[in-house]
């Protein structure tokens, strides 16, 4: 697959990269988590903007979100690439907003494009606007991670592969898919869908995982099927089933060349 390289980290080349989430209700706490990431196994950081709240508990506007991004970048001190994610309630996040509000907030985040490298864009939320959003973000120097999450089930293999391919066809630099397995068979379906999508779009970097305990194996061995990154925690989890980043790094190192 073709690599997307950000701050010297090549997504789609070598072993799967470990993304560690920053998940906090205040910008100060988010910056504190960011400052501690240098001592972890993180290859990249993900700033989740959806849990952030203003001092009075209200939802921060785009300007406040941009300020939070800049504060986290300063705390990271240039050490790690930063993925910025505003996860909506419809896909497991804590930011209630309409599709129109979501698209407007993403557009507003481009004002801070010099402070991060990758922007998560929910495929279902933006729909036919994805190509235009990709072009705007890419013109601002960002790589786009188009994403789709299903917290209720694992769709059929063909449907999952088609979704990954569609995100790439719409202009995303990376396609991400997360599903909820009912058991090991569903986890295997997710891995098979990853391999199928990779065979159909060999140049498109993919990030895939099955969530929860039944999906844990996909977070470790996904690279063998075509996933270029996985999520691990450094004390704070942003999704069910995320393993400790240090233990995840040890597992990936043990598997070695099978995941390259």
Language-model region placement:
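N-terminal amphipathic alpha-helix/helix-capping segment at the start of soluble metabolic enzymes
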Residues: 1-32, 259-260
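Alpha-helix-loop-beta-strand connector modules within alpha/beta enzyme cores
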Residues: 58-90, 111, 133-146, 192-204
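Catalytic alpha/beta core domains of metabolic enzymes, predominantly
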Residues: 123-260
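Catalytic beta/alpha-barrel core
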Residues: 23, 44-54, 85, 98, ...
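Short, acidic/polar
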Residues: 25-38, 97-110, 156-166
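Well-ordered, non-membrane alpha-helical segments in soluble/globular domains
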Residues: 31, 58-71, 99-106, 160-161, ...
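Short, well-ordered coil/turn segments that N-cap beta-strands
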Residues: 14-18, 41-43, 77-82, 115-117, ...
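Generic structural signal for hydrophobic
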Residues: 36-37, 72-75, 109-113, 137, ...
């Amino acid at each position: 697959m073709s690599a997307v390289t950000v701050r010297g980290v090549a997504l789609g080349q070598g072993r799967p990269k470990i993304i560690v989430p920053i998940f906090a209700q205040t910008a100060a706490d988010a910056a504190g988590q960011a400052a501690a990431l240098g001592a972890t196994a993180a290859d990249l950081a993900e700033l989740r903007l959806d849990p952030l709240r203003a001092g009075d508990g209200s939802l921060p506007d785009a300007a406040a979100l941009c300020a939070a991004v800049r504060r986290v970048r300063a705390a990271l001190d240039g050490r790690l690439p930063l993925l910025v994610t505003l996860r909506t309630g419809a896909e497991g996040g804590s930011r209630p907003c309409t599709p129109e509000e979501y698209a407007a907030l993403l557009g507003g985040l481009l004002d801070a494009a010099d402070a991060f490298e990758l922007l998560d864009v929910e495929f279902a939320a933006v729909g036919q606007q994805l190509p235009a959003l990709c072009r705007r973000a890419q013109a601002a120097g960002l790589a786009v991670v188009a994403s789709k999450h299903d917290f209720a089930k694992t769709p059929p293999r063909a449907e999952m592969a088609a979704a990954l391919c569609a995100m790439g066809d719409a202009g995303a630099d990376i396609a991400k898919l997360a599903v909820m397995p009912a058991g090991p068979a569903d986890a295997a379906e997710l891995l098979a869908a990853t391999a199928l999508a990779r065979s159909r779009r060999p140049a498109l970097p993919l990030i895939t995982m099955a969530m929860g305990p039944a999906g844990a194996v996909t977070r470790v061995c996904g690279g063998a099927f075509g996933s270029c990154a996985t999520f691990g925690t450094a004390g704070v989890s942003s999704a069910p089933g995320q393993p400790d980043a240090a233990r995840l790094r040890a597992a990936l190192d043990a598997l070695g060349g099978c995941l390259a």
